[in-house]
Amino acid sequence: MKHRLLSFILLLSILFAIPNFAAAQSAPGLLLPIGAGYTDTYGAMGQYAVANARGDVVHILILATPYSTNSDRISEGERAQNLKDAEERRIQTDGACQRSLPEGSTLTCKVELLPIFTQEDARDPANLAYFTDDVSMIFILGGDQETGIGAIINTPVEERINELHANGMIIAGTSAGAAMTSKVMIADLSTGYGVDDGLFAGAVEIWNSPDKRGLEFGIQNAVVDQHFFQRARIGRLLNAIAQPNIPNVGVGVDAYTGIVSNNEVLSDVFGLYAVAVLDAETYHAADNVKYVSIDPNRPPIMSFRNVVYHLLAPGDVTYNLNTRTSSLANPAPTLDRSFETLTIPAGAGPLILSGDLIDNLEDSAVLNEFKTIAGENIFIVATGYPSGRSAETAIKKYTDALGMQVKSVFVEDQPIEIPEGTSAVLVIGKNQEKVKTEALAALKDFWLAGNPVMADNAAMPVFGSFYAPHEPTPDDSEREELATQKSFWQGRTDIAPGLGWVDVTLEPQIIADKRFGRLTSLAYNHPELLALGINKDTAILFNGDGAKVIGDNGIFVFDLRTAALQLGTNEGFTIANAMLDVFVPGEMMLPELADVSTPVSMQATPVFPTAMPTPVPTLAASTFVTFTETAAPPTPAATEAVTEEAAPKFPVWVIFVGLAAVIGFVLLRKRK
């Protein structure tokens, strides 16, 4: 009888332990990519770490591998300096943790700096002792993502990080650390490419192989980029998500800003600014990307249609990477757009609107186009310059590049008078804040009479319906932040009426001067109008045939006419389902049907000698792939901001039930 009772108690104890054991099985931890910086995101990071405490201690590890210059070796001097620099971040993180503790809480903070900078460090068994089961969060610092992941990839340390994350540990990463939070990782721009070259084939080095990648458990359905608007990285992210065998969605996290990724659902933007989502999958923008050769000495440039553009600010809007849907609104199954405003009145002369030519006037394709239509008597109008001398210097540069004698005037407050016999007018400017819009009004009759007009740089935006009268982006960091990032807050960009020759809004130097915030502000406040961002050395030529891109780079068209709009808790712009197109030189600016079930016409992907770890497959130029209705992505149903469940795992409790049954049976047999 006694043995039967013991058997029964043992069986009951195991069965009662099953629910507790199952509850102890944690979901994977959150991912917190932070675009750059520390101070403005420490508060939220500390709160997440405290909420994830595994006991009485909030245990945080600081991983500073991105500080290394080489993931295979390090000098003692560099190690000492790295430890010293990272210790400052450890102290700051500890302070954030302390401030996040609830009042009266018995929790304590334990923040440790990992002495791991190389592969050798990550294979040292002694360093595994830091990775205890109670770790709440690992915080990966900024620096170089190549060495950041390179120091731990395929090592016992990475394996242990994988285990801890699978059991609920949070991974936060800033700057390079954020880049590591997507499995497919942008390593850098390729050698010889600058930020202005992001749209050119071969510009981006992408790591997507077993030995070169981001964290294995990182975001699977998107590629993360950081410093996004601060460094105008939209071109390189578009480039990355258009590559074969790469997720066709990009997440661009701005500096001093973070976001939560929970099982591929993005939510709870924290910090100061915005997070962009570029969806090149829903309407097959990545599959239909075109590679256009504009210069035999340069790689082809990439042309995009129907990228879905989302913007998230702090607030309640979420984005599901699995379904590619925003909680604010779903994308339409089809979208048939018209760009009827990209036309000029019948009988008007050609109009060229360019994004800044002054640094490359010699052999400028845009200026050469103007020369072919301008005739012999060009009149240069300078406006928006700080002084007459500054205007004269600029006029001379354009005059020399034109290679002919011209008449010119520096406009202050008086309306211009066009000299008799003028065949074309070139309007140039430096500072949109100082452009004298009213003084240019007399130009319209001249243009409507069939005469060519060109406007460059700061003079160009005033020819749209509205423009942003601001100075160029300043060099000092505080004012630069105000111009490039705070412009994503409502009311931080001044907007004034333009001349209205073309019923759009315009912004020059869109990448070179980091003006996406200004363009977004124009688009958000006038969503009925197309918003055009024009790169340096690039222009739109309007004539009787329509609008055509000329020059050396791309033009961004933001279309918010069917987008859903909302302001975040910081008055930041929140946008769902805007449309983004990139037109390149030689192309007419005409939209294409956006259809989730449209056939895909894939162009050959140019292959260049790059540092990519594995060659990417390409299709022959003549290949045409047709997707049937069943193969096309379904129209997303309306979704709530829910957390996706993890893939089902083998129920471990079944083993315990079986074991209990066996033990009970054996004991009963022995009793008999």
Where do the language-model regions lie?
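Bacterial N-terminal signal peptides
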Residues: 8-19
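Glycine/threonine-rich flexible loop motifs
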Residues: 145-154, 432-439
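C-terminal and late-domain segments of enzyme folds
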Residues: 25-56, 62-75, 81-82, 185-187, ...
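A short, well-structured beta->alpha microelement
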Residues: 108-126, 401-417
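Juxtamembrane/start-of-transmembrane alpha-helix segments at the extracytoplasmic/lumenal side
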Residues: 642-657
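Catalytic nucleophile loop
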Residues: 140-142, 160, 164-185, 447-467
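C-terminal membrane-anchoring or membrane-association module
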Residues: 654-672
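Bacterial N-terminal signal peptides that target proteins for export
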Residues: 1-9
